[in-house]
């Protein structure tokens, strides 16, 4: 999932402990959402109430995915250390403040990635390990190092790595990647641009100072607002796919329609008349949209 979430962590009011500094590097709230989406993939991959061995497998897989996701977040902090220091939203991070050295942070990232990869390979399955490692490379290297400073479409192309968690979860439980997992991938992939660009709209000065070619900086406010609205319409259609392809029932469909109408309505208002407050509301609703959508999919799977 994408690290742009400003709620991913919060500045400390006093000098944090060394443990707190390392923990902050993993962007814990972002990782929690990643693991939640992976868990949705795991649950949907099992057509019945999970047995204890399946529950144990899911817990082990969540631990491995959490470690590798945390490693990617820590690596991101190294690459974007100078950029983070120039942005109010990220200037508090331990690497940006110089509280943790780059070699130490790199060693921490490598240790997390290695531990998570071993857990997934030995106790889950090799496919999940390789897919998770590919996601690490996609986010930490392809997105952060190459795409983010190169193109305003960075979040669209790089969003593929952020959309992988349900696929990882599905692979963990089945050893394969089914079409249902790809539908979940598509939903997150299409959700990411309007989610991120809503944030970038009201943080545009931060991104301008950073020198990153984000869409509101390169193409302007009005163009970005239109893109946010258009993406919510395409996302609306994608959110109906679990029902169309028999992955869910009417409970999910009703929730998906309500959430999608709500997201598109926020985006339409933002497109028609801009304010930072509306952009912030749209961003926050996007978080509600994805979390509640997947929770509804989970409830529908077991209760209906």
From Swiss-Prot:
Miscellaneous: Carbon 2 of the heme B porphyrin ring is defined according to the Fischer nomenclature.
Keyword Translocase: no
UniProt-listed PANTHER family: 4-HYDROXYBENZOATE SOLANESYLTRANSFERASE (PTHR43448:SF7), PROTOHEME IX FARNESYLTRANSFERASE, MITOCHONDRIAL (PTHR43448)
EC category name: transferase
Stated family: Belongs to the UbiA prenyltransferase family. Protoheme IX farnesyltransferase subfamily.
Official protein name in the record: Protoheme IX farnesyltransferase
Cell compartments where the protein resides: Cell inner membrane
Membrane topology reported for the UniProt record: Multi-pass membrane protein
Function according to Swiss-Prot or TrEMBL: Converts heme B (protoheme IX) to heme O by substitution of the vinyl group on carbon 2 of heme B porphyrin ring with a hydroxyethyl farnesyl side group.
Domain of life, per lineage: Bacteria
Pathway: Porphyrin-containing compound metabolism; heme O biosynthesis; heme O from protoheme: step 1/1
The enzyme's E.C. designation: 2.5.1.141
A single GO cellular-component term on record: plasma membrane
An annotated GO BP: heme O biosynthetic process
Main location: membrane
GO molecular function: protoheme IX farnesyltransferase activity
Catalyzed reactions per annotation: heme b + (2E,6E)-farnesyl diphosphate + H2O = Fe(II)-heme o + diphosphate
Residue spans crossing the bilayer: 30-50, 59-79, 104-124, 127-147, 155-175, 181-201, 222-242, 243-263, 283-303
Keyword terms of this UniProt record: Cell inner membrane, Cell membrane, Heme biosynthesis, Membrane, Transferase, Transmembrane, Transmembrane helix
């Amino acid at each position: 999932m994408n690290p742009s979430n400003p709620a991913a962590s919060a500045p400390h009011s006093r000098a944090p402990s060394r443990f707190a500094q390392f923990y902050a590097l993993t962007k814990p709230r972002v990782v929690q959402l990643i693991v939640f989406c992976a868990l949705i993939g795991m649950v949907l991959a099992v057509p019945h109430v999970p047995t204890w061995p399946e529950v144990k497998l899911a817990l082990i897989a969540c631990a491995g995915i959490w470690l590798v996701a945390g490693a990617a977040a820590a690596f991101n902090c190294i690459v974007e250390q100078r950029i983070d220091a120039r942005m109010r939203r990220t200037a508090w991070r331990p690497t940006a403040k110089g509280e943790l050295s780059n070699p130490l942070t790199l060693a921490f990232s490598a240790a997390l990635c290695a531990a998570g990869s071993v857990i997934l390979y030995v106790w889950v399955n090799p496919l999940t390990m390789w897919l998770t490692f590919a996601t690490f490379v996609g986010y930490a290297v392809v997105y952060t190092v190459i795409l983010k400073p190169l193109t305003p479409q960075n979040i669209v192309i790089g969003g593929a790595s952020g959309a992988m968690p349900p696929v990882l979860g599905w692979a963990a439980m089945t050893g394969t990647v089914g079409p249902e997992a790809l539908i979940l991938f598509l939903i997150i992939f299409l959700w990411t641009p309007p989610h991120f660009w809503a944030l970038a709209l009201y943080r545009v000065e931060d991104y301008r100072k950073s020198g990153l070619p984000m869409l509101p900086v390169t193409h302007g406010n009005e163009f970005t607002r239109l893109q946010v609205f258009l993406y919510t319409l395409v996302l609306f259609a994608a959110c109906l796919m679990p029902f169309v392809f028999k992955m869910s029932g009417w409970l999910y469909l009703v929730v998906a329609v309500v959430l999608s109408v709500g997201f598109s309505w926020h985006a339409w208002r933002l497109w028609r008349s801009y304010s930072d407050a509306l952009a912030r509301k749209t961003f926050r609703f996007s978080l509600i949209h994805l979390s509640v959508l997947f929770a509804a999919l989970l409830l529908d799977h077991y209760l209906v």
